Every structure is written in C-alpha cells, then in structure tokens.
Curated annotation (Swiss-Prot):
This is Small integral membrane protein 30. Residues 25-29 are extracellular. The gene is Smim30. Negatively regulates antiviral innate immune responses. Disrupts the interaction of antiviral protein MAVS with innate immune receptor RIGI and inhibits MAVS aggregation, resulting in the repression of type I interferon signaling and innate immune responses. Interacts (via transmembrane domain) with antiviral protein MAVS (via transmembrane domain); the interaction disrupts MAVS interaction with RIGI and inhibits MAVS aggregation, resulting in the repression of type I interferon signaling and innate immune responses. Keywords: Endoplasmic reticulum, Immunity, Innate immunity, Membrane, Mitochondrion, Signal, Transmembrane, Transmembrane helix. The chain crosses the membrane at residues 30-50. It is a single-pass type I membrane protein. GO terms for biological process: innate immune response; negative regulation of type I interferon-mediated signaling pathway. Residues 1-24 form the signal peptide. It comes from Mus musculus.
C-alpha cells in the first residue's frame, strides 16, 4: 500500500507542476485554435465535395 500512496503523491506533484503551463493559454491561443478548427472543417468539406463531383462524373 505504501507504493500506491507514493505513486499518487508523484502524480499529484507532476500535475501541480504542469498546471501553471496550462493556465498560460491566452485569448490569442484560443482564437488561433478556433480558426484552425474552422479551416480544417472547411477543407474537409471541400475535399468531400470534390470527391462527390468526381464520383458523379460532373468533373
């Protein structure tokens, strides 16, 4: 049981060390993430549209 408590303490300590890095996310990072998601979805839809047109013989 002692090793489990030691592992738990190590995990909690590592999470506390990582936490300030997570808090450093700013509004610019959030905007960049949302823009990336929107552009990725748009690109996927464009590729699906091209595939559908080729499959139907319209291109």
């Amino acid at each position: 049981m002692n090793s489990v408590s030691t592992q738990l303490i190590l995990v909690l300590a590592s999470l506390l060390l990582i936490l300030p890095v997570v808090e450093a996310v700013e509004a610019g990072d959030a905007i960049a993430l949302l823009l990336g998601v929107v552009l990725s979805i748009t690109g996927i839809c464009a590729c699906l549209g091209i595939y559908a047109r080729k499959r139907n013989g319209q291109m």
